[in-house]
Amino acid sequence: MKLRNVSKNNLNKEDTKLSIEQFGGNVEWFNITKTLSESLPYIQQFSGETFIIKYGGAAMTDKKLAESFAHDVVLLKQLGINPIVVHGGGNKINEFLEKINKKSTFINGLRITDAETLEIVEMVLCGLVNKNITQLINNAGGNAIGLCGKDANLIEAKKICYTYKENQSNNVEKILDMGFVGEPHDINTDLLFFMEESDFIPVIAPVCSGENNLTYNVNADLVAGALANAMAAAKLIILTNVSGVTDSNGNLISELSVSHAENLIDNGTAHTGMIPKLQTCVRVVKEGYGSAHIIDGRIPHVLLLELFTIHGTGTMVVNSGV
């Protein structure tokens, strides 16, 4: 399907031009009306489409932000958009690991996961975090169902291994065993399409099964990206604890091409947890027809601001030059 072009840069601003004088100088009325009128082209464009939302960070741990997120998700559903929520929960996992004095090691934003850590990850993500998010959305008036990748073979994973050079002089690559860390390999889209048609909102924990009935801890960004491609989603939205993608001087980049995003990874400007996020966004816009957004989850109702206003709030990754 070809989407109409109503990007931030292509919307005709004259179509929504209003003046404060028309509202008797009432700035509040002006701002409310302006925002609502700006949203119409986006609502018309995306009605019936699927949005994959990766939820994590401060938006999850702060009660008021969590409630505003839940209300935004329900509003999307009411507008005819089909949101699918994929969540992380790293802070809560760290909290439980600290109770047993266990430290975590991360490689390129991925947690090395042994058997003991995997047990904690599955307990926290599937049994605690997932159900809390589901309840919040239901409390806001939605019909959310909590799942993990293992349910109905929703997401099949395969083991991840990293190669690295121990010594630059001999140029010999070694394999780093990440433990029970996987990446998405296959998606059961039938279940998700059924849930969309039944007006349910899937909330997915990134704990998946793989070969030989093994369980894998899969990075939530990677799961969200795989779902976006499998479901031909119009948008992938990743909530973070930063304003978006920044350049080497710390300035926010509001719109980012695939080539620019790849350069930020290669030159080290993007690092730690931003690496899998940008890699996921690049993969999605290369293989799909939608766009990917990295936005600041610390802002109340940031989903609505990014999706339904002219200027947005974070970084949009698109498959074209800027």
From Swiss-Prot:
Its EC number is 2.7.2.8. GO terms for biological process: arginine biosynthetic process via ornithine; L-arginine biosynthetic process. Keywords: Amino-acid biosynthesis, Arginine biosynthesis, ATP-binding, Cytoplasm, Kinase, Nucleotide-binding, Transferase. One of its GO terms (molecular function) is ATP binding. Substrate binds at G89, G90, R111, N217. The record marks K54, K277 as: Transition state stabilizer. This is Acetylglutamate kinase.
